[in-house]
Amino acid sequence: MELNLDIYVDYKDKRYKAEGYYGPSVGDLVLIFMDMELEGATVQEVARIEGSEIHLRTPNGNEPSYRYMGQYLILKPYGSSDPRGDILVHEDVQYVRVDAQAMPGDLIEALEPNKLPFSGKRFKYRPAVLEVEYVLTKDEQVLQLENGKSYSGAYRVLIPRMGVLPPKTHIYTTHKHVFMEDVFVLGNSYELSSPNDVEMTPIHAVFTGFSKNRDEAIFVNPYYNDDGVTGTMITVSDLLTGKWDITPLVPKKGV
């Protein structure tokens, strides 16, 4: 018989839910076992990773920070939409960590970087953010990552947060797991183009909302296009499968 328990922790007048043994990043709140007591601490630095042992540098009240080696649980805020503890910053862009199956083009955070065979050495840097080139097997999720390296460890998919798409610094970036409500900002302008139609002229349009059943995103061009049509409706499934590229248009400073 397998017994599944949810662990809830009250810490500094807030309630958190323990989400398992994920790889921590700077800023995460963790629950640790220290001096025969359970304590909450904020991760200041991930010092070193050796196999499954993780060394943390955490503050303890007013005392200086110290190294910690042992078991821990990542704590996520419970009972609110506050995403703290789920946020990861990579290349100056905020991402939300989500539990999802990776697709080609996704960015992932490798939770077991010791399983990354980079030139015969362990991947030393945290967080270990890499892009998925393609999925080798669907059942056990063996991924081929950028630079042709395979990975079969635990991971979380990274989603751009708060309407900001990341700079296209990666080769395969399509971000098929994008949450529409997070990515598209009502009234903002976007450039729409089709990677499968090289002859298509990119469209500049304003996002005006979703259709009633939320299966289409509606963009309006304030000027008529060649067909005399001002509106463009894009099927959400087409966005998720990479049939359209959408880039936010950001005004220059002072405009």
UniProtKB/Swiss-Prot annotation:
Protein name, UniProt field: Putative gene 39 protein
Native source species: Bacillus phage SP01
